[in-house]
Amino acid sequence: MRAVFPGRFQPFHLGHLAVIEWLLSKYDELIIVVGSGKDSHTIYNPFTAGERILMIKKGLKEFNVDFTRVIFFPIMDSFTSGLWIRNLELYSPKFDVVVSGNPLVISDAREAGYIVDLPPMFNREMYNATKIRKLMLENNESWSELVPKSVYSFIKEIKGDERLRDIARNDY
């Protein structure tokens, strides 16, 4: 069976990694959909879709996850109920299962007739992208412990943490 796992991955962290490892233990193939594909350079979505795909690939490689069974692609958001899943069907290879904890995604997937699998939350209080971005904004390097080392290095290389702080600056 092929499962689809949508997320924003802003940034990709160890909780995401744990879910992906769990999914690959259950399913033959996994489609990772990078949501908010056109959004970047905001506090909520600081990284581009391409940067996020690279983060995921680097993190999976670091932990020796077989990503030959993984398909990656970005998708733009749709805020109309039912339209998001239809867009996903247009751009994605066929899939059998939608994996999400997002109530709107779950509702749309079920209404479209898909099996929904709720992923376990692997230490959600700790591994939380909003928390990680907040730590970056505060210039608190403890966020480095919440992401794979390769992702930390990549974010530093592209100055993603500096970008986030620059975006957050207000000159009035």
From Swiss-Prot:
One of its GO terms (biological process) is NAD biosynthetic process. GO terms for molecular function: ATP binding; nicotinamide-nucleotide adenylyltransferase activity. The keyword ATP-binding applies. Its EC number is 2.7.7.1. Pathway: Cofactor biosynthesis; NAD(+) biosynthesis; NAD(+) from nicotinamide D-ribonucleotide: step 1/1. It is found in: Cytoplasm. It catalyses: beta-nicotinamide D-ribonucleotide + ATP + H(+) = diphosphate + NAD(+). It comes from the Archaea. It is an enzyme of class 2 (transferase). Pfam families: CTP_transf_like. Keywords: ATP-binding, Cytoplasm, NAD, Nucleotide-binding, Nucleotidyltransferase, Pyridine nucleotide biosynthesis, Transferase. The keyword Zinc-finger does not apply. One of its GO terms (cellular component) is cytoplasm. Its main location: cytoplasm. Belongs to the archaeal NMN adenylyltransferase family. This is Nicotinamide-nucleotide adenylyltransferase. It comes from Sulfurisphaera tokodaii (strain DSM 16993 / JCM 10545 / NBRC 100140 / 7).
